[in-house]
Amino acid sequence: MILTKNSNEKKPLKKGLFIVFEGIDGAGKTSILKQLLEVLKEPKLVNKIFLTREPGGKNNNAAEMIREFFLKNLEVFDPLTLAYLYASSRAEHVKKTINPHLEKDHIVISDRFVHSSYIYQGIVQNQSLDVIYQINQQAIGELEIDYVFYFDVNVNNALNRMKNRFDNTNAFDSQNKQFYEKLLKQYPSVFKVYNQPKKIIFIDANKNENEVLCEVKEQLLKIFKEHKYI
């Protein structure tokens, strides 16, 4: 029996809003994230939204150094070692980037966070999810995710996008179709058990990019209004 890794104890209200985009490679979340500041032009949101990504972190030299080191050497590490390396980068990201922005009441939107480790370092590489949880709790402390946007895409669409994109790919992008099918089956269940966000928003990422961008924008504006940012 797997116990839900969430505490029911009441914690002090934190400032800011923490939103995470999750999904397999090729789901399109990174492309959408890069366009958000162009489409979210509400005056009250100026200087309020901070976009970042994992592994690593925007304007975070330590997290980026760790990222660069292990992404260049993925094949040489034991899976458990990789889990620690990802968590080490995440610890730097949380302590030096995410938490400081939340303390300023900013809206932090991250391309990937802890659930990616449960999928990639846990399920895919046959590591205990409880161990992955313990490692990452040291990294993130009491930080909680407010919203997860899960970009749901079928494997064929994801693989086609990866083949057509022009940026450099890492070793995970070269895995076969079965690899990504395994990820798709496990993602939703992981959200329910570990570091459960306050709300999960499913995005149909099989649509064209403009349609997905409009849907994400609409959902985000609803959230910002609910939390009185606009």
Swiss-Prot record:
It comes from the Bacteria. GO terms for biological process: dTDP biosynthetic process; dTTP biosynthetic process; dUDP biosynthetic process. It is an enzyme of class 2 (transferase). Signal peptide: none annotated. Its EC number is 2.7.4.9. InterPro entries: P-loop_NTPase, Thymidylate_kin-like_dom, Thymidylate_kinase. Keywords: ATP-binding, Kinase, Nucleotide biosynthesis, Nucleotide-binding, Transferase. One of its GO terms (cellular component) is cytosol. GO terms for molecular function: ATP binding; dTMP kinase activity. It catalyses: dTMP + ATP = dTDP + ADP. ATP binds at G23, I24, D25, G26, A27, G28, K29, T30. PANTHER family: THYMIDYLATE KINASE (PTHR10344), UMP-CMP KINASE 2, MITOCHONDRIAL (PTHR10344:SF4). Phosphorylation of dTMP to form dTDP in both de novo and salvage pathways of dTTP synthesis. HAMAP family: Thymidylate_kinase. NCBIfam families: DTMP_kinase. Belongs to the thymidylate kinase family. This is Thymidylate kinase. It comes from Ureaplasma parvum serovar 3 (strain ATCC 700970). The lineage of its organism: Bacteria, Bacillati, Mycoplasmatota, Mycoplasmoidales, Mycoplasmoidaceae.
